[in-house]
């Protein structure tokens, strides 16, 4: 985890330093630029890491997920035993296991630490999937935890947030100066309007980048689920999802880590956290045994 954080921070600092050089060439005040970079990094990463640290608490509260401490039914006992076995195979600590009330077939994983995560399944999943299919879904979620996807997404979002804040203000300043014709006249009301609009535009592109990365993660988590539960079980689980694909009612903060995402075509597809189920199934069918 810490190696990943260090690498992302190092990359972010290097690119921001390059941006600082470019902005200096464009005539942006270096002192103002340094302050802007620091402010952007604090706000950009701060929000992402606060969300990450609170992710388990917020997920439980928003979904009403009930953590299984002492199994009361054979199903709950099976859930705990399956997650424990898969967590050991993946080399991570035993996550909390929870069930939340939801009609859709879905599950999610969250948590700031791969050794202190949460895996939750919907009541709809338990009602409509057999144990082989449910085992594959649990393997998919354990793979998310083992791959450190929650931390990686938080780091990526922090980098993107930082760049949105910086670029919106730098480009806004350049446009404002060009329109007013006076760099020293101070920022007018128009500058803040321009920055607001640019943050919306750049934020949209940042979301597209984050969702592209999220879709890549899903293929990897499917492969991990296939390794833990078996490729045929993982394919069967995704086929079941394709037959019973309903509205995703998961809260936005955990949707990216569910087994199933939304559907859409054209431009809307660029903002989806999950690839189409047909593509995920095809990728599993095309994978050879050693890749799984």
From Swiss-Prot:
Describe the family membership recorded for this protein in Swiss-Prot or TrEMBL: Belongs to the peptidase M48B family.
Report the GO terms under cellular component. Answer: plasma membrane
Q: Which domain of life is it from?
A: Bacteria
Membrane topology of the entry:
Multi-pass membrane protein
EC number of the protein: 3.4.24.-
Q: Where are the transmembrane segments?
A: 5-25, 34-54, 155-175, 193-213
Binding-site residues for Zn(2+), renumbered to this chain: 140, 144, 218
Location(s), subcellular: Cell inner membrane
Task: Cite the cofactor comment.
Answer: Binds 1 zinc ion per subunit.
Name the cofactor(s). Zn(2+)
What InterPro entries is this protein classified in?
Answer: HtpX_protease (IPR050083), Pept_M48_protease_HtpX (IPR022919), Peptidase_M48 (IPR001915)
Protein name listed in UniProt: Protease HtpX
Is the Cell inner membrane keyword given for this protein? yes
Q: List the active site.
A: 141
- Keywords, comma-separated and alphabetical: Cell inner membrane, Cell membrane, Hydrolase, Membrane, Metal-binding, Metalloprotease, Protease, Stress response, Transmembrane, Transmembrane helix, Zinc
Its GO biological process annotations read:
proteolysis
Single annotated GO MF: metalloendopeptidase activity
